C-alpha cells in the first residue's frame, strides 16, 4: 500500500450511522464528534508507523477548525476543492507545531461534538483577534501545491513561504 486517503464525509456518515441527506437525523452528522476524531487520529498514527503517507479528502480537509488537529495528528496531504486551496494554505501556515499540539491535546480530552466545535471555534476566533492576520505563527518547511490536483502536500512541515 502506497498511501491512505481518508474520506471524511463517508467516514463520518458511517461512524455516526447517520444519513446526512435525511433531515430527521442530519443534525447528528459531525466530523467534530470525538469518535470520528479518534478514528482519524488512529488511521494517521498507524499509517505513520507503517511508513505510509496519509491524506484526507472531504469537507474536513479544508475546514479551518480541523486544520490544527490534522497537523498535530501528522496528516501528510490535504485534498481540497479548488475554491478552498488558497484559504487552506493560509490556515495551515498560520499554525505552529506547538500551538496545534496544545489545541489537539485539549480537544482529545473532550467528550461531545458540541464541546469540541465550540472550543475550536472560540479558540480560532481568539487567535485571529490576537494576531490580526495568520502570518505570525509559521511552520518550518514549504507547503507545496501539486499541479491541478489541488492536493496540498506536507514536505516535513509548513511555513507558507510559497503563498
Regions found by a protein language model. Give the residues of each.
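N-terminal polybasic/positive-inside topogenic patches
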Residues: 134-139, 150, 157, 162
Amino acid at each position: 500500500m502506497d498511501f491512505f486517503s481518508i474520506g471524511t464525509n463517508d467516514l463520518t456518515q458511517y461512524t455516526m450511522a447517520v444519513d446526512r441527506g435525511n433531515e430527521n437525523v442530519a443534525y447528528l452528522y459531525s466530523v467534530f464528534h470525538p469518535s470520528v476524531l479518534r478514528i482519524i487520529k488512529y488511521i494517521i498514527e498507524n499509517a505513520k508507523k507503517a511508513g505510509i503517507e496519509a491524506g484526507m479528502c472531504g469537507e474536513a480537509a479544508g475546514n479551518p477548525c480541523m486544520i490544527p488537529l490534522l497537523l498535530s495528528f501528522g496528516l501528510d496531504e490535504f485534498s481540497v476543492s479548488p475554491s478552498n486551496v488558497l484559504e487552506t494554505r493560509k490556515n495551515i501556515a498560520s499554525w505552529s507545531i506547538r500551538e496545534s499540539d496544545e489545541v489537539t491535546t485539549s480537544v482529545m480530552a473532550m467528550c461531545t461534538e458540541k464541546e469540541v466545535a465550540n472550543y475550536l471555534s472560540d479558540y480560532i476566533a481568539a487567535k485571529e483577534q490576537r494576531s490580526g492576520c495568520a502570518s505570525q505563527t509559521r511552520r518550518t518547511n514549504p507547503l507545496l501545491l501539486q499541479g491541478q490536483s489541488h492536493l496540498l502536500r506536507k514536505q516535513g512541515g509548513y511555513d507558507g513561504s510559497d503563498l
